[in-house]
């Protein structure tokens, strides 16, 4: 008769803060996404759990999802004005009261790798952990205990920055300009690699002149973005969060382009 709880990753739950953010920013969204956003708004008035899986009419890859859910990068944690009503926090509180908590591999290792995000650990401490499909563990664990920087991350960062500019800081057009430059520079770097993602030797890629040139441009773009955002710190909590993401991206780029590192694998 023990209590059982199913806990999902944060991207599976409606983010009330991001939903409200997109209330007046229709110019950022295309028609299809706007229709999906209207459906989400209607559903949001009645849902108890905030689990996006309840919306059977919404495809798993619906374009609206990144706009109404959060990630570890853009979540404001305890600084969020909707923290007390957060569906993910409510789900975690329910899990804390359960005798058995069911999660997938990705959430388990993401939780282990969490640092100072404002939420702390999501999964309650357990006496026993049972893995199904344990042969997947090495590949999944390496995703969370390594470091990566992707064009998708920088694109999302630029998108979130554009939203702050359009909704809260309309007097700071340099945010838009610097964000777009960073997004385009990362996209140009991505074009130097195969269309389909593959594993390879990153140290060998770093010997290519065109790759080094584009990495240098990306580094410059991130540095400019860092300085521009710094001028507007404390004006908006979302912008402050983006500043931390830019700082993290700069540091990661420096580490990932240091081919002389010892004791690490680069791919």
How does the language model describe each region?
Residues 10, 212-267:
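Helicase motor interdomain insertion/brace
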Residues 1-101, 106-109, 161-162, 194-197, ...:
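A substrate-engagement module of RecA-like helicase motors
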Residues 18-27, 184-193, 213-220, 251-256:
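Short, charged low-complexity intrinsically disordered segments located at boundaries
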Residues 31-38, 50-66, 89, 152, ...:
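Generic alpha-helical secondary structure signal
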Residues 72-217:
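Signature of the SF2 helicase/ATPase Hel1-core->accessory helical subdomain module
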């Amino acid at each position: 008769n023990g209590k059982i709880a199913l806990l999902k990753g944060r991207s599976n739950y409606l983010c009330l803060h991001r939903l409200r953010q997109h209330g007046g920013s229709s110019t950022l969204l295309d028609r299809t996404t706007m229709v999906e956003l209207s459906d989400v708004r209607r559903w949001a008035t009645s849902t108890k759990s905030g689990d996006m899986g309840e919306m059977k009419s919404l495809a798993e890859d619906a374009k609206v999802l990144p706009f109404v859910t959060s990630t570890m990068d853009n979540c404001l944690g305890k600084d969020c004005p909707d923290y007390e009503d957060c569906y993910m926090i409510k789900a975690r509180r329910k899990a804390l009261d359960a005798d058995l908590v069911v999660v997938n591999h990705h959430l388990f290792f993401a939780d282990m790798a969490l640092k100072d995000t404002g939420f702390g650990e999501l999964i309650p401490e357990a006496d026993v952990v049972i893995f199904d499909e344990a042969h997947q563990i090495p590949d999944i664990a390496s995703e969370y205990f390594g470091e990566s920087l992707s064009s998708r991350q920088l694109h999302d960062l630029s998108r979130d920055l554009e939203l702050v500019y359009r909704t809260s800081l309309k007097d700071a057009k340099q945010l838009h300009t610097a964000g777009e430059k960073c997004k385009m520079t990362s996209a140009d770097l991505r074009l130097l690699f195969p269309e389909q993602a593959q594993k390879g030797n990153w140290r060998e890629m770093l010997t290519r002149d065109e790759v080094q040139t584009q990495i240098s441009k990306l580094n410059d773009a991130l540095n400019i973005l860092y300085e521009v955002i710094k001028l507007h710190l404390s004006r908006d909590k979302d912008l402050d969060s983006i500043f931390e993401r830019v700082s993290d991206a700069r540091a990661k780029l420096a580490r990932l382009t240091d081919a002389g590192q010892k004791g690490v694998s680069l791919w």
